[in-house]
Amino acid sequence: MCGIFGTTRRYERSVVEHKLELMNFRGPDHTGVEEIQTPDGEKLTFGHVRLSIIDLDPRSNQPFVYNDDISIVFNGEVYNYLELKKQYLGDVALRTESDTEVICAMYEKLGVDSVKLFNGMFAYVIYDRRKNIMVGARDRLGKKPFYFWHEGKDLEFASQPKVIKYGNNLHVDATARQFYLLQGIIPDPYSPFAEVKKLRAGECFTFNLSSGKLDIQTYWDVDTNSCGFTAPKSYDEAKLMVKDLLFDAVRLRLNANVPVGTFLSGGIDSSLICAIVSKFNKDLCAYTAGFDNQQFDESHFAVDVARSLGVPIKVCPCTGDDLMKVFNDYITYFDEPFADDSLIPSSLVAEKARQDVTVILGGDGGDELFYGYPKYEWTKARLHQYQKSYWLRKLFTPYFKHKGGEEEVMQSTQHDYADVYRSLGMFCYDMGGAEKFDRITLGKQQPDMKYLHNKQRGILAYSDYDMKTFMNAVNQKVDRATMRCSMELRSPIMDYRVAEYSRLLPYEYMINGELGLKRILKDILYEMVPRELLDRPKRGFVPPTKDWFRGEMKQDLFDTVSHDNLTNLLPELDADKFIALRDAFVNGKDISSRIFFTAYTYICLLYTSPSPRDYAA
């Protein structure tokens, strides 16, 4: 787990060093820079900050040079690198024990397509001197971030957007802002800045340094036709396969040359991962948060689960002052707007656990892949009602008097799933509480709306959509929350094989009347943990953002979310009505603080944060 940077622009060495310093928390163990002279006399610079996990020897520091012709910067882990060495590289002499060198050797043997064999979370770029090209890729589910700026014959990339921003005059992207107001995140391929894009999950690229041509390709998608599995013939067959895949995913993710632990909230997903980990090693410690607000403290549930598994557990005390400190650090570490304040306690728990371990396993991805959100149940019922009206429309279409009536009706049915999703308020990321934003420009179609239009997928289309969009939010949160304290989080449920197989499972395997949401995961877990320890409503911890905005941060809220700032910086919103909403909230009206957190963080990060040169101070 690291931070990567590269550019064809001619910066002074001090500028490159400052850029790397902006993300040194991602990799405090080593900082490296390589200045490369290309065959046509141009300059290419690679930079890397390393968090040492595999092969701690300095020989594996980056930028890494392989056989003189290949240089690489790499963030993440290729979990199956030992299997790849055995299967493909038996005749290759390697000088390290790192997965970094395996990526290089696999590229030399198989080319760009070698990425299709990697099981992991990664973002990497290779420079091939022989061809004078850069090739790069991002993992299938987008666990690791990758930002880039392509202009003319220049390409610059980094793990975080502020690294590209430093020393450059970038402009805010209005389309990204509109998506942020709707979703609470900036979806791929957008970034806060118009010039900067994200490589999307499952994409790879080739950049020709001589011509400046950038060719981006998709090497993996959620399309079930491309996966290596067949649909199960029974529920028992499906459960056994999911269990086997999860066990193997955990096995791969336990490999490290540094201390490893597990997050354990006491919920279904984290308990499942902790239970599987205990089958491999009962000595690995579990970590949970103990909040001083008893209304939200669930540490006793986690302790009960750990005791039933016979694993050690450490309750990390988290106070209101601790949370406030993390919030004050927001601008430094979370350099892209993110409207979910749960990232604050997530960051704090990671910080506490980092005192003992460098790598930690978590249960992220279970809700998106195995129907863990109540909206799936709501949407199923609503869709059934909606589709009944569709057949009525189709029946009466021949009797429409106006020209084009049939085409109009049939066109409308192509958007059934999107319409139902929108009617349930899923596009407007809880932007209201007791009130609603009065004006949000929907503008352009969302990038991944095509997944909702897939009629053959039925209700599963919603899960496909969440996997391509809201999983971005999960990935961004855990990446920033853990890298803030130089910790690597691994998510076995997000193994691409688990994701592929989950796409083949019918709705009733995911949700049923008795077990409710995430049926198949619960069935697997109940084989290892008593059901009575787990059957309870899911609450989650809500940081006291509302109290902060009404108390010690009240003036800061007024100064930041001001009428002028709303008018000039968030023009999609009605400034008069929003200010009235803000004042009513501060005076005690029951309104969701998330509305103001959304606006506050956007303005802070993009307009009131330090200038690029101040970042390096």
In which residue ranges do the predicted regions lie?
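Glycine-rich, phosphate-binding/catalytic loops in enzymes
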Residues: 64, 154, 376-380, 617
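Single conserved hydrophobic/aromatic residue that forms the stacking wall/gate
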Residues: 607-617
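Conserved glycosyltransferase catalytic-site signature
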Residues: 99-100, 119-121, 271, 299, ...
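Short, flexible loop segments at the rims of nucleotide/cofactor-binding pockets, characterized by
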Residues: 335-340
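Adenosyl-5′-phosphate
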Residues: 1, 113, 166, 195-201, ...
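A mobile, often basic/glycine-rich helix-loop segment
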Residues: 370-394
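Cysteine-centered catalytic environments shared across enzyme families
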Residues: 1-334, 346, 350, 527, ...
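Short acidic/histidine-rich active-site segments
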Residues: 357-367, 371-373
